[in-house]
Amino acid sequence: MALISMKNVTLKKQGKILLNNLNWKVKKGENWVILGLNGSGKTTLLKLIMAEYWSTQGQVEILNTRFGQGDIPNMRTKIGVVGSFIAERLPANMLAEKIVLTGKYKSSILYKEYDETELNEARQMLTVIGGKHLLGRIYSSLSQGEKQLLLIARSLMEDPEIIILDEATSGLDLFAREKLLTQVEKITELPHAPTILYVTHHAEEITDKMSHILLLRRGKIVAQGPKKDIITPQVLENFYESPVNIISIDDKRFFIKPQV
C-alpha cells in the first residue's frame, strides 16, 4: 500500500519552480532518507506532504487522502513531525512530559483538559525512547539533543503512520548526534512502527534501518530507490555533479568525500 503517492507534481511560488515534475511512491514498511544539499527543495517537499503547500500541477495522495478531495485535517493527525519549526513554538517553561503530551493534541500548548492517565502515557512514551531522565525537567533547561529526543517522543504520541525528521541532528555535537541516531533506529523496532522520512544533507547519518533513498537536487528527483541501488559511485557522482569517494563506516554506514 502506498502511503505517499506523487504523480507529475510541480510546485511554483511567485513564478519560481520549487519542485519540478516529481513522481514518487512510499510504501508501508519502507523508511526513506531524503538527501539533498541546501536549497534542493527538501523542506518544500516536506511542507507539501504535510499539506502546508499545495502543488501547482499533478496529483498528491497522502495516507489515502487525495489533495483537493479528502479530509486533510484528519490526514495531518496521522503524521508526526520533528523539526526546528516545531521546537520554536513550544513553551520554554513547560515540563518535559507535558511537552510530549502536546503531541496528542497536535498543538504547542495543552489547550484541553487532561488527566493523570494521559500524562502517564506521555511519561511512558518518553521512557520507551530512552528519555526517562528528562521527566520533571523544564524544556528550556534541556540541551539541544535532549530537546530533539523530547520532540521524537512528542511526535509518536498519536501513533502516527508517518514520522518526518527534518534535519533532526542540526546543532548537535558528535556524541549527541550518534545518540539521537540510535533513538531513531529504535523507532523502527516499536510495535506498529511508523514509516520514517529522514531529511538530511549528511550522508553519514543514513543508518542501517533506512531502506530507501531519494536524491533531490534543485527541486528535481535525480534518483530514488533501495539504498543499495543509490549508494554507488555512478549514481552519487551524477547527483553531486562531482567525483566522490564512498568510505564505509563499520559496514553499515558510509561517508561521502569529494575528490579534490
Curated annotation (Swiss-Prot):
Keywords: ATP-binding, Nucleotide-binding, Transport
Nucleotide-binding among keywords: yes
Alphabetized InterPro entries for the sequence: AAA+_ATPase (IPR003593), ABC_transporter-like_ATP-bd (IPR003439), ABC_transporter-like_CS (IPR017871), Metal_Ion_Import_ABC (IPR050153), P-loop_NTPase (IPR027417)
Domain ABC transporter residue range list: 4-243
CDD domains (alphabetical): ABC_ATPase (cd00267)
GO MF annotation list: ATP binding; ATP hydrolysis activity
Short name of one Pfam family: ABC_tran
UniProt-annotated binding residues for ATP: 36-43
This protein's name: Putative ABC transporter ATP-binding protein
Chain's gene name: abcX
